[in-house]
Design a protein with these regions (language model features):
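Catalytic-face loop-and-helix region of soluble metabolic enzyme cores
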Residues: 160, 164-231
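Anion (oxyanion) recognition and catalysis
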Residues: 16, 51-52, 123, 185, ...
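Active-site-adjacent loop and "lid" segments of alpha/beta metabolic enzymes
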Residues: 9, 70-82, 140-147, 190-215, ...
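Short, composition-biased local secondary-structure segments
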Residues: 58-63, 119-124, 150-154, 171-187
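C-terminal helical cap(s) of enzyme catalytic domains, especially alpha/beta-barrels
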Residues: 34-48, 180, 216, 227-238
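Generic hydrophobic/aromatic pocket-lining and core-packing "Φ" positions
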Residues: 12, 89, 119, 150-151, ...
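Short low-complexity, flexible loop/linker segments enriched in glycine and/or proline
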Residues: 38-40, 115-117, 146-147, 176-178, ...
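Active-site beta->alpha loop and helix N-cap motifs at the rims of alpha/beta catalytic domains
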Residues: 2-116, 129-147, 154-155, 159-167
């Protein structure tokens, strides 16, 4: 949302044109809605206009920041419209988002404990699909994904569990992913593996191999991140 591809052309439209089934907006401020390259008559029509142009469901990242998190890196401060709160969730509902994703960008101090809390809050304030989990540590000293945290997200009401794709985060193994997939599927949920640690800017073969391997491990949805030019993945990797 921070960079347009060219004048009056959003990166969301490019992603949709090259095969993206779902569009997830990162760094989007729900209290100050705007997308670079998108012209709207009123800010409150931003999401609806993007849905019309792309023909895709549109979601938003909201970050459940933990003020008490034990950080491994310098903590970054983000706007209130990007954090997971009752106010931002109600704003996302009003804007017309189809789904929310509770996760953390690098250095934001998002913890699994706060993700579970955000899911519970969202069940009362947002009517769309709820995705929950971490793509990487988000600067916090805790396991990125574990069976315990996954169970907490499911019990809180998450529809889709987000995990790092095997091959994107050091130490997260196929054995761990397979166990998580079985837990989620038994609960009736879906699993989304993510390429969110810059591998999306690698060659197409690298992305192909990661996606194929994680599909073999049982995931249902493959995410690809925003580390390419103009904060959209190179089109050949989509």
């Amino acid at each position: 949302v921070t960079e347009s591809a060219i004048d009056n052309l959003t990166t969301s439209e490019i992603a949709a044109a090259f095969g993206a089934d779902l569009i997830l907006l990162n760094l989007f401020d729900t209290l100050n809605p705007k997308v670079s390259g998108l012209e709207v008559d009123k800010p409150e029509n931003t999401v609806k206009k993007l849905q019309k142009l792309t023909g895709r469901p549109i979601g938003v990242n909201l970050e459940p920041v933990d003020e008490k998190a034990e950080m491994e890196s310098t903590k970054l401060q983000i706007s209130s419209g990007r954090t997971a709160s009752v106010k931002s969730m109600k704003a996302a509902e009003k804007l017309g988002f189809n789904f929310v994703c509770f996760t953390g960008n690098p250095g934001t101090g998002v913890t699994n404990r706060m993700i579970a809390k955000a899911v519970k809050t969202a069940k009362k304030n947002f009517s769309g699909l709820i995705i929950a989990g971490k793509m990487h540590g988000a600067g916090v000293d805790e396991p990125v994904a574990s069976e315990e945290s996954v169970k907490e997200f499911l019990d809180a009401g998450a529809d889709v569990i987000l995990v790092p794709a095997v091959g994107t985060v050091p130490g997260f193994t196929s054995e761990e992913l397979i166990k998580i997939v079985k837990i989620v599927h038994k609960h009736g949920g879906l699993v989304m593996s993510t390429i969110g640690t810059s591998q999306e800017s690698s060659g197409a073969q690298t992305v192909h191999d990661i996606a194929l391997q994680n599909k073999i491990y049982g995931v249902d949805i493959q995410h690809i991140g925003d580390a390419g030019w103009g904060v959209v993945p190179p089109t050949d990797t989509i």
